Protein backbone atom coordinates (compact mmCIF):
# COMPACT_ATOMS: atom_id res chain seq x y z
CA UNK A 1 0.00 0.00 0.00
CA UNK A 2 1.29 3.46 -0.87
CA UNK A 3 0.38 6.93 0.33
CA UNK A 4 -1.25 9.46 -1.95
CA UNK A 5 0.99 12.28 -3.13
CA UNK A 6 0.22 15.96 -2.48
CA UNK A 7 2.07 19.15 -1.65
CA UNK A 8 2.77 18.32 2.02
CA UNK A 9 6.48 17.71 2.60
CA UNK A 10 6.53 15.84 5.91
CA UNK A 11 9.39 13.39 5.45
CA UNK A 12 8.67 9.75 6.29
CA UNK A 13 10.87 7.93 8.77
CA UNK A 14 11.57 5.13 6.29
CA UNK A 15 11.01 4.21 2.69
CA UNK A 16 9.35 0.99 3.78
CA UNK A 17 7.80 -0.33 6.98
CA UNK A 18 7.16 -4.05 7.30
CA UNK A 19 4.70 -5.27 9.92
CA UNK A 20 5.65 -8.75 11.05
CA UNK A 21 9.05 -10.41 11.31
CA UNK A 22 8.07 -13.89 10.24
CA UNK A 23 9.59 -15.51 7.17
CA UNK A 24 7.60 -13.31 4.75
CA UNK A 25 8.55 -10.09 6.52
CA UNK A 26 12.20 -11.06 6.85
CA UNK A 27 12.44 -12.06 3.20
CA UNK A 28 10.82 -8.79 2.12
CA UNK A 29 13.14 -6.83 4.38
CA UNK A 30 16.24 -8.49 2.96
CA UNK A 31 15.16 -7.80 -0.61
CA UNK A 32 14.22 -4.18 0.14
CA UNK A 33 17.48 -3.56 1.96
CA UNK A 34 19.43 -5.09 -0.92
CA UNK A 35 17.59 -2.78 -3.33
CA UNK A 36 18.69 0.26 -1.32
CA UNK A 37 15.51 1.09 0.58
CA UNK A 38 15.57 2.34 4.15
CA UNK A 39 13.48 -0.25 5.93
CA UNK A 40 12.18 -1.04 9.42
CA UNK A 41 10.46 -4.22 10.59
CA UNK A 42 8.01 -4.11 13.49
CA UNK A 43 6.94 -7.23 15.34
CA UNK A 44 4.75 -7.74 18.40
CA UNK A 45 6.68 -10.80 19.56
CA UNK A 46 9.90 -11.07 21.48
CA UNK A 47 11.53 -13.20 18.77
CA UNK A 48 11.51 -13.17 15.00
CA UNK A 49 10.19 -16.10 13.01
CA UNK A 50 6.42 -16.11 13.40
CA UNK A 51 5.24 -19.66 12.80
CA UNK A 52 8.76 -20.93 12.18
CA UNK A 53 9.32 -21.38 15.87
CA UNK A 54 10.96 -23.43 18.59
CA UNK A 55 10.16 -23.61 22.26
CA UNK A 56 12.42 -24.69 25.11
CA UNK A 57 11.14 -25.78 28.50
CA UNK A 58 13.04 -27.49 31.31
CA UNK A 59 15.71 -28.65 28.89
CA UNK A 60 13.21 -30.00 26.37
CA UNK A 61 13.09 -28.55 22.87
CA UNK A 62 10.02 -28.52 20.65
CA UNK A 63 9.78 -27.38 17.03
CA UNK A 64 6.09 -26.65 17.39
CA UNK A 65 5.38 -24.47 14.36
CA UNK A 66 6.32 -25.10 10.73
CA UNK A 67 8.23 -28.37 10.59
CA UNK A 68 10.29 -27.55 7.52
CA UNK A 69 10.67 -25.00 4.73
CA UNK A 70 10.65 -25.29 0.95
CA UNK A 71 11.78 -22.64 -1.53
CA UNK A 72 9.94 -21.87 -4.77
CA UNK A 73 11.79 -18.75 -5.89
CA UNK A 74 15.40 -18.16 -6.81
CA UNK A 75 15.73 -15.43 -4.18
CA UNK A 76 14.50 -17.60 -1.32
CA UNK A 77 16.50 -20.58 -2.55
CA UNK A 78 19.58 -18.35 -2.38
CA UNK A 79 18.71 -17.22 1.15
CA UNK A 80 18.27 -20.79 2.39
CA UNK A 81 21.51 -21.81 0.71
CA UNK A 82 23.28 -19.02 2.58
CA UNK A 83 21.72 -20.19 5.86
CA UNK A 84 22.89 -23.72 5.12
CA UNK A 85 26.42 -22.55 4.35
CA UNK A 86 26.44 -20.68 7.67
CA UNK A 87 25.43 -23.85 9.52
CA UNK A 88 22.01 -22.45 10.46
CA UNK A 89 20.02 -24.79 8.22
CA UNK A 90 20.33 -28.20 6.62
CA UNK A 91 18.59 -30.56 4.23
CA UNK A 92 16.16 -33.25 5.33
CA UNK A 93 15.22 -36.02 2.90
CA UNK A 94 11.68 -36.77 4.07
CA UNK A 95 11.21 -39.38 1.36
CA UNK A 96 12.90 -40.21 -1.96
CA UNK A 97 10.92 -37.50 -3.74
CA UNK A 98 10.88 -34.78 -1.08
CA UNK A 99 13.91 -32.88 0.15
CA UNK A 100 13.21 -29.95 2.48
CA UNK A 101 15.18 -27.47 4.59
CA UNK A 102 15.10 -27.33 8.38
CA UNK A 103 16.80 -25.14 10.94
CA UNK A 104 20.03 -26.20 12.62
CA UNK A 105 20.05 -26.85 15.49
CA UNK A 106 16.37 -25.84 15.65
CA UNK A 107 13.77 -24.34 13.32
CA UNK A 108 14.04 -20.81 14.72
CA UNK A 109 17.67 -20.70 13.57
CA UNK A 110 16.47 -19.95 10.03
CA UNK A 111 14.58 -16.74 10.84
CA UNK A 112 17.42 -15.81 13.15
CA UNK A 113 19.80 -16.01 10.20
CA UNK A 114 17.45 -14.09 7.88
CA UNK A 115 17.09 -11.34 10.49
CA UNK A 116 20.81 -10.69 10.74
CA UNK A 117 21.56 -7.13 9.65
CA UNK A 118 17.91 -6.05 9.48
CA UNK A 119 16.57 -3.25 11.70
CA UNK A 120 13.76 -4.80 13.74
CA UNK A 121 11.70 -3.43 16.60
CA UNK A 122 10.44 -6.32 18.75
CA UNK A 123 7.66 -6.20 21.35
CA UNK A 124 5.92 -3.36 19.54
CA UNK A 125 2.30 -3.86 18.55
CA UNK A 126 0.75 -1.82 15.75
CA UNK A 127 -2.89 -0.86 16.39
CA UNK A 128 -3.82 0.67 13.03
CA UNK A 129 -2.47 1.78 9.68
CA UNK A 130 -3.44 5.33 8.76
CA UNK A 131 -3.32 7.14 5.43
CA UNK A 132 -1.64 10.53 5.87
CA UNK A 133 -1.14 13.33 3.35
CA UNK A 134 2.18 12.18 1.94
CA UNK A 135 2.93 8.97 3.79
CA UNK A 136 1.42 6.08 5.69
CA UNK A 137 1.54 6.01 9.48
CA UNK A 138 1.71 2.83 11.53
CA UNK A 139 0.37 3.75 14.96
CA UNK A 140 1.19 1.49 17.88
CA UNK A 141 -0.82 0.69 20.98
CA UNK A 142 0.93 3.51 22.87
CA UNK A 143 -0.22 6.05 20.29
CA UNK A 144 3.23 6.55 18.78
CA UNK A 145 3.60 6.50 15.01
CA UNK A 146 6.18 5.40 12.48
CA UNK A 147 5.87 6.87 9.00
CA UNK A 148 6.83 5.45 5.64
CA UNK A 149 6.21 5.92 1.97
CA UNK A 150 5.11 2.30 1.69
CA UNK A 151 3.99 -0.44 4.08
CA UNK A 152 3.99 -4.21 3.78
CA UNK A 153 1.77 -5.99 6.29
CA UNK A 154 2.61 -9.67 6.78
CA UNK A 155 0.49 -10.17 9.90
CA UNK A 156 -2.15 -12.92 9.81
CA UNK A 157 -5.15 -11.89 7.72
CA UNK A 158 -7.58 -11.27 10.62
CA UNK A 159 -5.05 -8.97 12.29
CA UNK A 160 -4.28 -7.27 8.98
CA UNK A 161 -7.99 -6.62 8.40
CA UNK A 162 -8.23 -4.88 11.78
CA UNK A 163 -5.17 -2.71 11.10
CA UNK A 164 -6.52 -1.60 7.71
CA UNK A 165 -10.18 -1.16 8.61
CA UNK A 166 -10.27 2.59 9.28
CA UNK A 167 -8.38 3.95 6.26
CA UNK A 168 -8.17 1.08 3.78
CA UNK A 169 -11.60 -0.61 3.90
CA UNK A 170 -11.30 -2.36 0.54
CA UNK A 171 -7.99 -3.96 1.48
CA UNK A 172 -9.41 -4.81 4.90
CA UNK A 173 -12.33 -6.62 3.27
CA UNK A 174 -9.96 -8.64 1.12
CA UNK A 175 -7.90 -9.63 4.14
CA UNK A 176 -11.03 -10.51 6.11
CA UNK A 177 -12.12 -12.93 3.39
CA UNK A 178 -9.12 -15.19 3.98
CA UNK A 179 -9.72 -18.44 5.83
CA UNK A 180 -7.29 -20.39 7.99
CA UNK A 181 -6.90 -24.06 8.80
CA UNK A 182 -6.20 -24.39 12.54
CA UNK A 183 -3.59 -26.76 13.94
CA UNK A 184 -3.77 -28.01 17.52
CA UNK A 185 -0.26 -28.91 18.67
CA UNK A 186 0.84 -30.68 21.84
CA UNK A 187 4.39 -30.89 23.17
CA UNK A 188 5.34 -33.79 25.40
CA UNK A 189 8.50 -34.09 27.47
CA UNK A 190 9.17 -37.79 28.02
CA UNK A 191 11.33 -40.01 30.19
CA UNK A 192 12.27 -42.13 27.17
CA UNK A 193 11.57 -41.83 23.45
CA UNK A 194 13.89 -44.47 22.01
CA UNK A 195 10.97 -46.78 21.19
CA UNK A 196 9.06 -44.13 19.21
CA UNK A 197 9.26 -43.85 15.40
CA UNK A 198 12.38 -42.03 14.19
CA UNK A 199 10.62 -40.70 11.08
CA UNK A 200 7.68 -38.29 10.82
CA UNK A 201 4.28 -39.86 11.36
CA UNK A 202 1.40 -38.81 9.10
CA UNK A 203 -1.83 -40.59 9.97
CA UNK A 204 -4.87 -38.64 8.72
CA UNK A 205 -7.07 -41.66 9.40
CA UNK A 206 -6.20 -41.12 13.07
CA UNK A 207 -6.39 -37.29 12.87
CA UNK A 208 -2.60 -36.91 13.11
CA UNK A 209 -1.21 -34.37 10.65
CA UNK A 210 2.37 -34.65 11.87
CA UNK A 211 4.17 -36.23 14.80
CA UNK A 212 7.91 -36.27 15.33
CA UNK A 213 10.34 -37.46 17.93
CA UNK A 214 12.41 -34.32 18.39
CA UNK A 215 15.68 -36.15 19.12
CA UNK A 216 15.42 -37.94 15.76
CA UNK A 217 15.36 -34.79 13.63
CA UNK A 218 18.57 -34.25 11.65
CA UNK A 219 20.81 -31.29 12.55
CA UNK A 220 19.18 -31.31 15.99
CA UNK A 221 20.35 -30.02 19.36
CA UNK A 222 17.63 -31.74 21.39
CA UNK A 223 18.90 -34.36 23.82
CA UNK A 224 16.02 -34.75 26.26
CA UNK A 225 13.28 -37.09 24.95
CA UNK A 226 10.45 -35.04 23.47
CA UNK A 227 7.52 -35.55 21.12
CA UNK A 228 5.58 -32.97 19.11
CA UNK A 229 2.15 -33.95 17.80
CA UNK A 230 0.15 -31.77 15.41
CA UNK A 231 -3.48 -32.68 14.77
CA UNK A 232 -5.08 -32.63 11.34
CA UNK A 233 -6.81 -29.44 10.27
CA UNK A 234 -10.21 -31.14 10.37
CA UNK A 235 -9.78 -32.43 13.92
CA UNK A 236 -8.30 -29.12 15.05
CA UNK A 237 -11.27 -27.16 13.70
CA UNK A 238 -13.71 -29.46 15.47
CA UNK A 239 -11.82 -29.38 18.79
CA UNK A 240 -10.28 -25.90 18.84
CA UNK A 241 -12.25 -24.98 21.98
CA UNK A 242 -11.48 -28.14 23.93
CA UNK A 243 -9.51 -27.79 27.13
CA UNK A 244 -5.78 -28.43 27.00
CA UNK A 245 -6.11 -31.57 29.10
CA UNK A 246 -8.79 -32.97 26.79
CA UNK A 247 -6.78 -32.28 23.64
CA UNK A 248 -3.61 -33.76 25.14
CA UNK A 249 -5.34 -36.95 26.24
CA UNK A 250 -7.12 -37.45 22.92
CA UNK A 251 -4.07 -36.79 20.77
CA UNK A 252 -1.87 -39.09 22.86
CA UNK A 253 -4.45 -41.84 22.37
CA UNK A 254 -4.58 -41.19 18.63
CA UNK A 255 -0.78 -41.18 18.35
CA UNK A 256 -0.47 -44.44 20.26
CA UNK A 257 -3.07 -46.05 18.01
CA UNK A 258 -1.42 -44.77 14.83
CA UNK A 259 2.16 -45.61 15.84
CA UNK A 260 1.60 -48.74 17.84
CA UNK A 261 3.83 -47.26 20.54
CA UNK A 262 3.07 -46.28 24.11
CA UNK A 263 3.80 -42.71 25.18
CA UNK A 264 5.05 -42.18 28.70
Q: Regions from the language model: what does each represent?
A:
Residues 10-24:
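Beta1/beta-strand and adjacent pyrophosphate-binding region of the FAD-binding site
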Residues 68-75, 89, 93-115, 238-250:
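Short beta-strand to alpha-helix junction loop
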Residues 122-137:
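A conserved short coil-to-beta-strand element within the FAD-binding core of flavoproteins
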Residues 17, 31-57:
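Glycine-rich FAD pyrophosphate-binding loop
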Residues 12-14, 141-150:
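Core beta-strand elements of the Rossmann-like FAD/NAD(P) dinucleotide-binding domain
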Residues 187-240, 246, 250-260:
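Active-site substrate-recognition segment that forms the wall
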Residues 31, 53-91:
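N-terminal FAD cofactor-binding segment of flavoenzymes
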Residues 49, 145-201, 261:
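Central helical "cap/lid" subdomain
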Amino acid sequence: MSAATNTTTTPPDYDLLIIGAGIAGLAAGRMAQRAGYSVMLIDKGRRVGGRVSTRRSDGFMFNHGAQYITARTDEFTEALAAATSAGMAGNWQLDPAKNVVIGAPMMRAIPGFLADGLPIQQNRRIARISRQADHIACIDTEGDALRAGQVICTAPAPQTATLLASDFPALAATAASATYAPCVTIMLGLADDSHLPATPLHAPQHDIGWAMRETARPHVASTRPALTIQASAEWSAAHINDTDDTSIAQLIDKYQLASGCSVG
